[in-house]
From Swiss-Prot:
Transmembrane segments: none
Keywords assigned by UniProt, alphabetized: Amphibian defense peptide, Antibiotic, Antimicrobial, Cytolysis, Disulfide bond, Hemolysis, Secreted
The organism of origin for this protein: Pelophylax ridibundus
Protein name: Esculentin-1R
Location(s) in or outside the cell: Secreted
Tissue spec. comment: Expressed by the skin glands.
S-S pairs: 40-46
GO terms (BP aspect): defense response to bacterium; killing of cells of another organism
Family statement drawn from the similarity comment of this UniProt entry: Belongs to the frog skin active peptide (FSAP) family. Esculentin subfamily.
Main localisation: secreted
Known function: Shows antibacterial activity against representative Gram-negative and Gram-positive bacterial species, and hemolytic activity.
InterPro entries, A to Z: Antimicrobial_frog_2
Length: 46
């Protein structure tokens, strides 16, 4: 019915926002790691 449709929509939105924030965290880690690797390559410390 109407209730399950609303519940499904809310769950979907929660899931999407959860995935987005997880993606952002992972993305930041990847960027940081990339910067670290680039930095040590430039300095020749890898």
């Amino acid at each position: 019915g109407i209730f399950s449709k609303l519940a499904g929509k809310k769950l979907k939105n929660l899931l999407i926002s959860g995935l987005k924030s997880v993606g952002k965290e992972v993305g930041m880690d990847v960027v940081r790691t990339g910067i670290d690797i680039a930095g040590c390559k430039i300095k020749g410390e890898c």
